[in-house]
Amino acid sequence: YEELRKIAAEMISEKTDISVEKVYDLFCNETGYQTPKVDTRAAVFMDDKILLVHENNGTWSLPGGWCDVDQSIASNTEKEVKEEAGFTVKAEKLIAVQDWRKHNVTNYAYGVVKAFVMCRYESGNFEENIETTEIAFFGKDEIPDHLAVEKCTREQIIMCFEAYEKPEMSTLFD
C-alpha cells in the first residue's frame, strides 16, 4: 500500500503542481478512499442584482466556503453569508450541484462538490472583516472581471441569475 500511496501522490502532484511531499502529507492521516469536500455558494439578490463579496486578495466572489461538519448545505450557506457579508439570509432553493474540476480553475489536490443556493435577504449590514473588504450588488451585465474563479466563475454567476429569473427552473447537477 505504501508504494501505491507514493505513486498516487506523484500523480496528484503532476496534475496539481503541488509538491509530492505536500500531497503525501495531505493524505497521511486519511483512511479509506477519498471523498470530495463540499463548498457552498450563496446567490443573494436585491433589486435584481446579485451580491458579491470583495475578498482581501482583490477578487470578487459569491459569498460561501467549505461546509463545516456540523452544518447542512442550507445552514452553512447562511452562516457564510453572515460571516462574509454581515447579512442574515434564508436559504430557499438549491440552484446547482457541480463538480469543481468541470467548472472552475483549480489545482487543488482534493475533489470538491460545489452547491449553489438561492437565498433571501432578511436583515443586516456589512462591516469589513478578515475575509471581506467590501460588498456590492451587480447586474447581469455588470459582473466584475477580477473573479475568484476557483470559487465562482462568470458562467456560474450567470447560472444564478437564470435561476433567479426563472424560479421554476429545476436544480442543475453534473
Predicted regions and their residues:
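Conserved positions in beta-strands of structured domains
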Residues: 45, 92-95
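Acidic/histidine-enriched, glycine/proline-rich intrinsically disordered or flexible terminal extensions
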Residues: 162-174
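Glycine-rich active-site/cofactor-binding loop and its immediate structural neighborhood
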Residues: 29-78
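Acidic, metal-coordinating catalytic segment for phosphate/diphosphate chemistry
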Residues: 2-41
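Residue-level "edge-of-site" marker
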Residues: 56, 94-97
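Unchanged
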Residues: 67-91, 99-156, 172-174
